[in-house]
Amino acid sequence: MRIAIVDDISEERTLLRNRLESQFSRRNVHTDILEYENGETFLTAAKECPFTVVFLDIYMNGSNGIDTAKELRRSDTDCLLIFTTTSTDHALEGFQVRACLLYTSDAADE
């Protein structure tokens, strides 16, 4: 399973990566997890080799997660898209790009 984590905050990427690796290793699921600090770099990589799952922060420097998701959907309609954010303000926009889940960073800490 090829997974992308797109977030401009390194600590957030590392935290999510560690959680994912822990969960998947317990289930003996092989994953290839790649991290990107901005939407532009991620989109370039996604065009070369698509991802199965994409965790995408909405609030990033440069292009935001909504714009990145819209661009992604032009070339990849199949990946599971999960927004990571501390706010639900953009939930409706998330559904417009077929995001399956709005994952809030605060909820993961509970």
Question: PLM features: what roles do these ranges have?
Answer:
Residues 103-109:
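Conserved small/polar residues in nucleotide/adenosyl-binding loops
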Residues 57, 78-88:
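A short, hydrophobic beta-strand element within the central beta-sheet of small alpha/beta folds
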Residues 35-53:
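Acidic, metal-coordinating helix/loop segments flanking the phosphotransfer/catalytic sites
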Residues 9-34:
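Two-component/phosphorelay signaling modules centered on CheY-like receiver
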Residues 7, 57-58:
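Active-site residues of response regulator receiver
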Residues 38, 64-67:
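Acidic catalytic/metal-coordinating carboxylates
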